[in-house]
Structures are given as C-alpha cells and as structure tokens.
A protein has these predicted regions:
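Active-site- and interface-proximal helix/loop "cap" or "latch" segments in soluble metabolic
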Residues: 2-143, 147-172
Length: 172
C-alpha cells in the first residue's frame, strides 16, 4: 500500500442492561458493529456494504471456527452477560482485563475468550444511564441495533482527509 492509501475501522458497541431493585445487574444484552473504511490514492473512500451487527451476522461472523471454545460471538457475549448478572455496576467496572482486553478471571475465560474490556465499559455506561421502568422479576434486557449507511463511497478533499461521524442515540 502506498503512503496515500489509508484504512480505518469504527467499532461501535451497544449494551442494554436491566438492573434489579438493589441496583445489581439482572440481565445484559450486547451487540457490536465493526465498520472498516478504506481510501485509495485518488481520495476515493469505500464503505462496507454489509452493515449487520455481530449478533445479526450469526454464523457469518466466523468466531466459532477459530475460538478455542468453538463458540460464536453471540454465545460468548451472552456468557459475558450471564457472568455479570448479580454484580453491581462498581463490581463490573472493576473487572480486570489483560493487555488484550480479555478477562483475567478463569471462570469467565472458560465460557468467554473474546476481549471484554469494551463491553465492560459499555455495560458500566448503560448502568449509569439506566432509568426505572418497572420491569417484572425475570424480565429481559432487549437491544435493537440499526445501522444505516447512506454513502457507500465518498471522496476525500485535496488533502485526502475524510471525516466520518458516528451518531449514537443513547438517551433516545
């Protein structure tokens, strides 16, 4: 690749949490969107055509084939959510990870080998933004993620700079 060719990646994590009356995690739902962006020497920027989240991709996201656990992304993300159940937001925040973002907890590693540092941080933020909704005991957290990419190709300015914006709607 020449010095004029550029590549970038945008990772966006979504977390929904349900807290019990004591403020402990009762349920977690996670998802993530990975978007890779490339730019060539003419300034043409190409966006991906597959806008699905990791959960939406299911078996099309081939983690199970390379995982020592032989589990896909959704299974491991759900295992992480189950691990967090019963913990306070402060306990979640203190979850130790290694330099690769993976948990240092052997029990969690037996069911989830993906990097969890970003998911941990998203769950903490979701807990901080949580509002009482009067859920029944045994209620589940539900998460809907929609990605819309109206521009598959962009052209950079004369300096070959492109500005991409990620908009989130945390507060609805």
């Amino acid at each position: 690749a020449s010095d004029q060719e550029r590549a970038g990646k945008i990772d966006t994590i979504a977390a929904a949490v349900l807290l019990d009356a004591e403020g402990r995690v009762a349920d977690v739902m996670l998802d993530e969107v990975e978007i890779s962006v490339t730019g060539d020497s003419t300034g043409k920027v190409t966006m991906p055509t597959d806008d699905r989240t990791k959960r939406q991709k299911g078996d099309d996201y081939p983690l199970a084939a390379v995982s020592s656990l032989k589990k896909g992304w959704a299974e491991q993300a759900d295992a992480f959510g189950n691990y967090l159940t019963g913990k306070t937001p402060d306990e979640v925040k203190k979850l130790a990870t290694d330099d690769d973002g993976k948990s240092k907890d052997a029990d969690l590693l037996s069911t989830c080998t993906i990097a969890v540092d970003g998911y941990r941080d998203a769950v903490v933020r979701a807990c901080e933004n949580a509002k009482a909704v009067g859920s029944a005991r045994g209620g589940r957290a539900v998460l809907g993620v929609s990605v819309r990419n109206d521009t598959k190709e962009l052209t950079a300015d004369d300096d070959h700079d492109v500005r991409l914006y990620v908009l989130d709607d945390v507060d609805g």
